[in-house]
Design a protein with these regions (language model features):
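Short S/T/G/P-rich N-terminal loop/turn motif that feeds into the first structured element of a domain
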Residues: 1-71, 94-108
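C-terminal structural segments of small proteins and small subunits
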Residues: 76-91
């Protein structure tokens, strides 16, 4: 079952972003993943504004692929640069529908 990673970042230093973008996409792809979006155009519609200045959504075939990506030694220097350049939150969700009302999703 597909899983999604939601990366929320509040940038304090964006000097790492270009290098990260140029090098991390192939590492994501190596683990079967792909970026669905990566944007600095963040608008809070409801709830607390946490000051996120960059949000990315990635899709992977399964949770094991996310773990393999995150622990890949090739990714380590880019992950460290990202962590040093802002406040980060990475969340993983699966592709279920907890109430069973979305016709194209698997019920939980």
């Amino acid at each position: 079952m597909s899983v999604f990673v939601i990366a929320e970042i509040k940038l304090s230093n964006d000097s790492w972003v270009s290098d990260y973008g140029a090098n991390v996409h192939p590492i994501v792809e190596k683990h079967g993943g792909k970026y669905l979006t990566l944007s600095r155009n963040v608008t809070v519609l409801e709830g607390e504004d946490r000051g996120n200045t960059l949000i990315g959504i990635l899709q992977f075939p399964d949770a094991a692929s996310v773990v393999a990506f995150a622990s890949d030694p090739d990714y380590a220097p880019y992950g460290k640069a990202r962590q040093a350049g802002g406040i980060n939150s990475f969340q993983m969700i699966d592709d279920t529908d907890i109430v069973g009302t979305i016709s194209y999703h698997a019920a939980a």
